[in-house]
Structures are given as structure tokens and as C-alpha cells.
Design a protein with these regions (language model features):
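Helix-loop-helix units of permease transmembrane domains in multi-pass membrane transporters
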Residues: 71-105
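Aromatic- and glycine-rich beta-strand/loop motifs that create alpha-glucan
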Residues: 1-24
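Hydrophobic alpha-helical transmembrane segments of integral membrane proteins
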Residues: 21-22, 59-60, 189-190, 195
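Secretory targeting signals
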Residues: 18, 24-70, 100-164, 171, ...
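Cytoplasmic juxtamembrane interface segments
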Residues: 1-6, 73-86, 151-178
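Transmembrane alpha-helical segments in integral membrane proteins
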Residues: 65-78, 154-165, 229-247
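Terminal transmembrane helical anchor/hairpin motif
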Residues: 35, 40-49, 168, 173-250
Length: 250
């Protein structure tokens, strides 16, 4: 497994995967940075507004990002038709484990870099609201769970089809459907895994003053049930991907 992981690390270095992992935090900084609050009342709700907006941004960006990472993880085996050759040179378990571990670490890197921008933006914009450590930790766990679930879903699709293009197309369509799920009834959004970032969010709009155009944010209880279902769904997709590799003929 270590040899397979080292090989994935070398391939990722040549593909410049680190730059790809930096893309999402960069887009988020540019996106949110352009909406920098200046009113003292907005600064007092700065972190709440940011943590309310982040799941919506994730529902737009992350399905595509996970599809790109998953497709790049197996692209050389598909383009060069070398998967069957690799199965004869090393065990399928070590090959799959190396790729799975490397993929999860890439997902973890993207999630850490993205949410590390929260205190940075708060510092730069001068938020006066107390830093919500517990809410940020919960958002990190939820984001990582949904990212990993989508990653293995796209990876499984690519293994089934033998082509990275359908996975990318599903990621793009999933981003649109996930965004639309934000405007669906709460129950309907539970049937759209691409948009789980939004129902898992602990922030909601408590009040909007139409006269002053000010928004007051509130929190709701953590959605542990949906988080557990997301983790279970990710585990099922991982197991199906491993079974597909096991059953593939040489």
C-alpha cells in the first residue's frame, strides 16, 4: 500500500494537484471577499453570515471539485488501459488502498484549506462577533463527510463506466441540483446528496428587516441524523468501489 501511495504522490506532483486543491479556497476568498461588510451591525454578525453562506458556496463548487479529484485519481489507468496490468503486478487491495487513502487526504486538504479561510477573513474584515469555534468544528466535520461521500460516489461511477467524462458531467449537474435544493422544502433536500451541505448547516435566517436591509442570523440544533446517514452512505459507496475493483476481470 505504501508503494502505491508513493506512486500516487508522484503522479499528483506531475499533475500539479496541489494547485487544484488551492483553487476552492481561492475562489471562496474572492467570492466572499467581494461582499465584505462595512456596517457595524453587519460586522457584529460577520461570522454568522459567513458560516451561513459557506454551505451554499460548497453546494456549487464541491460536487464539481470532487468529480475532478476522483477522475484524476484513475485517469492514467483508463487512458493507458493499464489497470489489468497493475492487477498482475501488485495486489488489488494495495492498489485500491493507496488510491483511496491518497484521495481522502486530498479531500481533507481541500476542506482544511477552505475552512482555514474563515478566521483569516474574519481578521481581514474586522468581524466583531465572537469566534464560533464549536460551529466551525461542526461545519468542518459535515463538509468533510459530504466531500468524502461525493468523492467515492464519483470514483465508483468512473469505475463502472470506465470513462472520467460521465463523472465530471454528473458533478456539474449535481452542483446545479444541489443549489436548487436550497430552495426546496427541507424534506425534499434530504433526497439530494449533492446538496447535503445546506440541510447540515446549523445557521438560518432568523429575521430580515426589509426597511434597513439587515439580516439577523440564528442557529438550529446540529443535524446528527443526516450526518450519520452521510457517513453511512459514504461507507457504502466506498465498499461498492472496492467490490468493483475486486470483481474486475484481468
Amino acid at each position: 500500500m505504501l508503494r502505491s501511495f508513493h506512486a500516487e504522490l508522484q503522479k499528483a506532483h506531475r499533475r500539479h494537484d496541489l494547485l487544484l486543491c488551492l483553487l476552492v479556497p481561492l475562489i471562496m476568498i474572492l467570492w466572499v471577499g467581494g461582499l465584505a461588510p462595512s456596517d457595524p451591525e453587519e460586522l457584529a454578525n460577520g461570522y454568522s453570515a459567513l458560516l451561513y453562506s459557506l454551505p451554499v458556496i460548497e453546494a456549487i463548487l464541491m460536487p464539481v471539485m470532487m468529480a475532478v479529484l476522483a477522475s484524476r485519481l484513475w485517469d492514467m489507468e483508463i487512458k493507458g488501459n493499464t489497470a489489468k496490468l497493475l492487477y498482475t503486478l501488485q495486489s488489488r487491495r494495495s492498489l485500491f488502498a493507496g488510491k483511496a487513502v491518497f484521495g481522502v487526504l486530498e479531500v481533507l486538504l481541500v476542506t482544511v484549506l477552505e475552512l482555514a479561510c474563515v478566521p483569516v477573513l474574519g481578521r481581514v474584515h474586522g468581524y466583531t462577533e465572537a469566534f464560533p469555534t464549536g460551529q466551525l468544528v461542526y461545519l468542518f466535520i459535515c463538509t468533510l463527510a459530504v466531500d468524502t461521500m461525493l468523492f467515492f460516489g464519483e470514483f465508483l461511477l468512473m469505475l463502472w463506466v470506465g470513462n472520467p467524462l460521465p463523472a465530471l458531467c454528473v458533478g456539474i449537474v449535481g452542483a446545479l441540483v444541489g443549489l436548487f435544493s436550497a430552495f426546496m422544502p427541507p424534506l425534499a433536500s434530504y433526497f439530494v446528496p449533492f446538496g447535503y451541505y445546506i440541510p447540515l448547516s446549523a445557521y438560518e435566517v432568523a429575521n430580515w428587516d426589509q426597511a434597513t436591509h439587515t439580516v439577523t442570523y440564528g442557529t438550529r440544533p446540529f443535524n446528527w441524523g443526516l450526518l450519520a446517514f452521510t457517513l453511512a452512505l459514504g461507507a457504502v459507496l466506498f465498499a461498492l468501489a472496492w467490490r468493483k475493483v475486486q470483481d474486475e476481470e484481468v
